[in-house]
Design a protein with these regions (language model features):
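Membrane-water interface of transmembrane alpha-helices in multipass transporters/channels
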Residues: 63-78, 144-156, 187
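Transmembrane helix-loop junctions at the membrane interface of multipass transporters and ion channels
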Residues: 63-70, 136-145, 176-182, 207-216
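Juxtamembrane helix-boundary/capping and inter-helix hinge elements in multi-pass membrane proteins
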Residues: 99-109, 181-187
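Alpha-helical transmembrane segments in multi-pass membrane proteins
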Residues: 46-54, 58, 77, 81, ...
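Short helix-perturbing small/polar motifs within transmembrane alpha-helices
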Residues: 26-27, 38, 102, 124, ...
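Membrane-interface alpha-helices at helix entry/exit sites of multi-pass transporters
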Residues: 105-119
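Re-entrant/interfacial helical elements at transmembrane boundaries that shape
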Residues: 76-79, 90-101, 176-180, 191-192, ...
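Cytosolic regulatory modules rich in charged/polar residues
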Residues: 1-78
């Protein structure tokens, strides 16, 4: 086996992993040589599945529609919470998928991984919440003169931020291990579903805190 052959194999493996993590069926042709129909066929199944699974987010929003109407300012923070949760989950899943591929962790290490990510998420969540509270008070309330951004609203958002980061990292680190355990490719199983799961969880946490703190 020549060095060039080995490099070609490595490139193909890396490309396949990247495509899997982006919710695409792996292809064996260069991008410009892959036909439109082939590309469509590789991308549509996962997009369809993720679109259907994302309806849970819509159901949650519909269920708490009255809360949103009573405190409309809550709506403006949903993208930030969902984005932060998705990014947090992706960080954890990427680290675990890489560790699995290198043989650094196994399913038997699940609780050790969860314990580590729990404390990482607590530290990250508290740091993000503190920064966000300052931003909401100084920028949103004082600089932009938005009276609807009250300390109570900021508390709801920041508490949700901590809970979302915690759930996202625990989901992100456990899904690849569970996928490996049941015989699925961790990159295929974990990455596409993390954002969908975290979006739903973050909304549930958000509206529960809003109900408890704001009395909605």
């Amino acid at each position: 086996v020549t060095v060039d052959d080995a490099i070609d194999v490595l490139q193909e493996e890396v490309t396949e992993d990247i495509e899997k993590m982006a919710a695409m069926l792996p292809g064996d042709k260069p991008y410009l040589k892959t036909g439109i129909f082939e590309t469509w066929k590789a991308r549509t199944p996962w997009l369809m599945l993720l679109m259907l699974s994302a309806t849970f987010t819509g159901i949650i929003l519909t269920h708490f529609e009255k809360s949103l109407m009573a405190c409309a300012i809550l709506t403006s923070f949903i993208p930030m919470l969902s984005g932060t949760g998705g990014n947090s989950g992706t960080q954890a899943s990427t680290a675990v998928i890489r560790a699995l591929s290198l043989g650094e962790v196994r399913f038997s290490d699940l609780f050790q991984v969860l314990w580590k990510e729990f404390w990482v998420s607590v530290c990250c969540g508290l740091c993000l919440a503190a920064a966000n509270f300052v931003k909401m008070m100084l920028v949103d309330r004082w600089l932009l003169q938005n009276p609807t951004v009250t300390p109570q609203v900021a508390l709801v958002v920041c508490a949700t931020l901590v809970g979302t980061v915690l759930c996202a990292k625990l989901v992100g680190c456990s899904l690849p291990l569970l996928a490996k355990r049941i015989g699925f490719d961790p990159a295929v199983m974990a990455s596409p579903f993390i954002t969908t799961i975290v979006d739903a969880l973050s909304l549930l946490i958000y509206f529960r805190f809003a109900s408890a703190i704001l009395g909605l």
